[in-house]
Amino acid sequence: MLRVGSYVPRNASGGKTQEGNNTLQATAGKLRIVARAEWRLGEEAGDPWEGAKAGRWLGEGGSAIVRAGLRAWKESGVEEVNGRGVGIIGVGRGGEWPGWLEETSVREVVEKWRDKSPLWLLEVLPNLPVAQLAVEIGARGPVETLRERDGIEGDVEKRIQRWGKRGGKWVVSVRLTSTGAKAEVWGCEGEK
């Protein structure tokens, strides 16, 4: 263990003495990709999430994110890991309203509400598939969901490396694609 102490003098901005100790893992360092996987929409063979009840409200794209992440996690060969040492970063398009909701009045929405299950609300939450993946693999580290934009790959890699420097052992990065989802497991080879 590497112990880091910090002290901010009394005349620093804020006017308070701020002391704190931060304990970092001595093994903290650069994480590398140790496994990659993909899940295509409509794929059925080798489903790592077969029979899961949670998949019914995630929608096709959300389920693809969870399945790609689970497949990559399995292929990484990680056996036992402290859940706090595992983080998840997801990249997606964000939630979209269902087609039946477009161009309808408030009255029509209320009337259709009785016919349609309110579980569709869960499908429009962009962070739900990433949170579900964290539950499935037992990750208790940071769970982040980012919106797709130009330059997002660099931002994701910076976040992964920052997590590695703070003592994180594993990060599962998942991304929604036009054909399904892709996932990468970042970690230290020696930690398996």
Model features per residue range: what roles?
Residues 1-192:
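Conserved "HGTGT" condensation-loop signature of ketosynthase/thiolase-family condensing enzymes
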